[in-house]
Amino acid sequence: YKEDFHKIVSVVGGGGKTTVIRAMLRECMENSDGRIPCAVSTTTHIQKTNAEYFLGEPSMKMFRKKLSDYEAVWMGREIRKGKLASFQKEFLEEVSREPVLLLLEADGAKHFPVKAPAEHEPVICEKTGIVLNVYGMRAIGKKIKDVCFRIGEVEKILGKTGEDILRPEDIMTLALSRSAGRKCVTDEM
C-alpha cells in the first residue's frame, strides 16, 4: 500500500458480498503495517452499519473527518431500516480521488448464495481496478431453484433446470461466463 494508491474494488455475485466487504474493511483497519484508509459504499444497495464511522449524507467535509478519525468510512443514504442506497455518482467519483481504498457492493442477490445478473446488472464503476465475484459454496449439492437468484438466467447459462443439483463445475461456469461472473468486467479489471 502506498500513499498515492487509488483503487476501487467492486464486489459482485451471490450472497456474502457484504460479509466479504466487512472482512476486507476489518483487515484494512487491523493491518499490522499500519491501517489502510478504506471507504465502503454501494452502486446498488448494502446493509447499514451502526459503527461510529458511518456517513449518512454526501459531505466531503464529513467524509474526510471520519476518515481522519477512524481511517474507515461506511457510507450511503438510508432507504429503509438497515438498508442503504448509493450516494450520487458524482460524490463517489470525488471519494475515489481521495487516498483511500474504495470497496463497492455492485450487485444484489436477495440473500441467495448464487446468481446470474439481469440485463441491468451488475453496476460496476468504470474506474474499478478489481472485480471480486462472490459465490456461496453452501449452494453446492442443492437444487438450483433453491439456491439461485435469477434462476432463468442461471438455467440458460448452465443449460440445466431448476430441479438439477448445483455442482462445483457449475459455479466455475458461472464465474467465467461473460453473461454472469465476468459480465461488465473489462480486461483491465
Feature locations, PLM:
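Loop/turn-to-beta-strand initiation segments
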Residues: 69-73, 97-102, 130
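General beta-strand structural signal in soluble alpha/beta enzymes
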Residues: 11, 38-42, 74-77, 102-106, ...
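Walker A (P-loop) phosphate-binding motif
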Residues: 1-29
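Gly/Ser/Thr-rich loops at beta-strand to alpha-helix junctions
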Residues: 13-19, 45-46, 108-110
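N-terminal phosphate/diphosphate-binding loop that engages ATP/GTP or pyrophosphate donors
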Residues: 25-82
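A short acidic (Asp/Glu
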Residues: 20-21, 50-51, 115
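Short coil/turn segments at beta-strand junctions that form active-site/ligand-binding loops
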Residues: 5-7, 34-37, 98-100, 129, ...
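Conserved catalytic-core segment of NTP-binding enzymes
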Residues: 82-88, 93-97, 107-189
